[in-house]
């Protein structure tokens, strides 16, 4: 019986940077350090940082005057930044640089008075933050589209001054049909730059696709509120492989392993390798004697910390 590890898997550069920002701030300024929203969507990471002195809040009114606050990797609306400035809070922005690039695109279109369609999941903090970048004072409007049906129904004012952007945790494949629908309806719609698309999301999904045909079970390490982790599980299932999302090895059920001989393992972009190795050890203890690494795209991207934390 064999365990095959997908590559790449686990932490991306944006998550690494966000965690480093919180830990560095704790080292330099001491606890408590306030973090608006979970810095990344992983229960283990959040609890670890909480134990080190991070205090997670959902809104800035929970942060005392004079405190240090960190914005999560998902990004925040302009109004949140403005409130922090008004209150004189010391702020460190852990927004993923790839999310920031999308924010800049939205701002550029807004200043031109162009309408923008955001392809993403309603209620996800990244989507809330990106929608909150759009300045309507220039006469434009921004819309959220989640499905092909939304794209077929959406009504906009000027199809010749229109652009779309996407939530970074959605891959090219995730958005393909929606974008095609928008292009058919609005031939002059402007697309986002190719390098604005999150490399990590695409690479992790491609790794699952390449590995799925070799497995009769797939385990994805990640938290239930992690968008990209859920998508990895869905991809394996669509390819006909039984798949489960687990926060840790303790959530693996014995019945899942019955009759299985080749188990694929991957991790969402916010799940640490420590949890993957615990899953591997659990599988070893259940008779999976061989562990191999599946070939995949090598990632060497590193995002720098804010100057004040270097």
UniProtKB/Swiss-Prot annotation:
Q: Which residues bind (2E)-4-hydroxy-3-methylbut-2-enyl diphosphate?
A: 41, 74, 124, 168, 226-228, 270
Q: Does the keyword Membrane apply?
A: no
GO terms of biological process kind: dimethylallyl diphosphate biosynthetic process; isopentenyl diphosphate biosynthetic process, methylerythritol 4-phosphate pathway; terpenoid biosynthetic process
Q: Where does isopentenyl diphosphate bind?
A: 41, 74, 124, 226-228, 270
Binding positions for [4Fe-4S] cluster per the UniProt entry: 12, 96, 198
Pathway given for this chain reads:
Isoprenoid biosynthesis; dimethylallyl diphosphate biosynthesis; dimethylallyl diphosphate from (2E)-4-hydroxy-3-methylbutenyl diphosphate: step 1/1; Isoprenoid biosynthesis; isopentenyl diphosphate biosynthesis via DXP pathway; isopentenyl diphosphate from 1-deoxy-D-xylulose 5-phosphate: step 6/6
Query: What is the E.C. number?
Result: 1.17.7.4
Q: Spell out the coiled coil positions from the record.
A: none
Q: Which cofactor does it need?
A: [4Fe-4S] cluster
Gene3D superfamilies listed in its UniProt record: 3.40.50.11270, 4-hydroxy-3-methylbut-2-enyl diphosphate reductase, catalytic domain (3.40.1010.20)
Checking Pfam families in the record gives: LYTB
Chain sites annotated for binding dimethylallyl diphosphate: 41, 74, 124, 226-228, 270
Q: Name one GO molecular function term.
A: 4 iron, 4 sulfur cluster binding
Q: What does this gene product do?
A: Catalyzes the conversion of 1-hydroxy-2-methyl-2-(E)-butenyl 4-diphosphate (HMBPP) into a mixture of isopentenyl diphosphate (IPP) and dimethylallyl diphosphate (DMAPP). Acts in the terminal step of the DOXP/MEP pathway for isoprenoid precursor biosynthesis.
Q: Which family does it belong to?
A: Belongs to the IspH family.
What protein is this chain from? 4-hydroxy-3-methylbut-2-enyl diphosphate reductase
Q: Which organism is it from?
A: Thioalkalivibrio sulfidiphilus (strain HL-EbGR7)
